[in-house]
């Protein structure tokens, strides 16, 4: 979309990306792509975190994050957008916040898989171990691994892993049950990008790999789950 618009005509503007994802084929972050297409006088910021439009419309509040490489712009956006409906926090890690926000959609699909095979009780383990592997990736990419435990990833799980509004969770469950699903599930494309990053940075992403195998390699979901449970024993917080 940015490539099609006359973005170079913009000068001295702030572009806020209210989306979560990574570029297929490269794993590149959206802010980096936007920055490469915009004139250097512009500033890119990201608006990330949990929340569904349906709930905001009903007056249900939530917390979110705004991040940018420009601290002054970031502070201005947080101060101007904060309200009784959304409490914003200042982000401090573009890599971790963007990668974490994108990866949570893949975890959402995995949650749908668990619902589809009637093993929803494993969602606690999925949340814990999924966060751990995303933290490893963020660290390898030069970000702060603690970002995986913040609002942009772990903090967004309720809206993705459990919510009836989650397109990714619904897609995962429908996929397992061989039912048609016609809404956008961003995690379907994001998992491809994560496989690129996994290879590039040499990081283990067993849950993301299992999701990829089921979606793209027609792997058996129960067999993939069994393989995850049979992985070598280790301490919970080993790298």
Protein language model regions, located:
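Short beta-strand segments
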Residues: 17-18, 45-48, 67, 110, ...
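NAD(P)-dependent Rossmann-like dehydrogenase/reductase catalytic/cofactor-binding core
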Residues: 104, 111-112, 117, 139-239
């Amino acid at each position: 979309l940015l490539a099609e618009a006359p973005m170079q005509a913009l000068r001295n503007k702030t572009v806020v990306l209210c989306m979560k994802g990574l570029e297929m084929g490269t794993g590149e972050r959206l802010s980096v792509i936007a920055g490469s297409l915009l004139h250097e006088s512009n500033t890119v910021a990201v608006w990330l975190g949990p929340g569904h439009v349906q709930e905001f419309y009903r007056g249900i509040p939530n917390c979110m994050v705004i991040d940018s490489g420009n601290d002054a712009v970031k502070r201005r956006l947080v101060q101007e957008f904060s309200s009784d409906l959304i409490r914003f926090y200042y982000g401090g890690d573009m890599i971790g916040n963007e990668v974490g926000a994108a990866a949570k959609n893949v975890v959402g699909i995995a949650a749908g898989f668990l619902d589809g095979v009637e093993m929803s009780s494993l969602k606690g383990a999925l949340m814990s171990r999924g966060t751990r592997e995303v933290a490893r990736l963020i660290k390898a990419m030069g970000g702060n691994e603690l970002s995986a435990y913040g609002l942009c990833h772990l903090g967004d799980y309720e809206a993705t892993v459990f919510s009836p509004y989650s397109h990714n969770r619904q897609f995962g469950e429908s996929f397992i049950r061989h039912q048609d699903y016609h809404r956008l599930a961003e995690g379907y494309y994001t998992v491809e990008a994560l496989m690129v990053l996994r290879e590039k940075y040499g990081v283990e992403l067993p849950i993301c790999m299992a999701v990829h195998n089921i979606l793209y390699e027609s792997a058996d979901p129960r067999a993939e789950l069994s393989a995850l449970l049979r992985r070598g024993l280790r301490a919970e917080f080993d790298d």
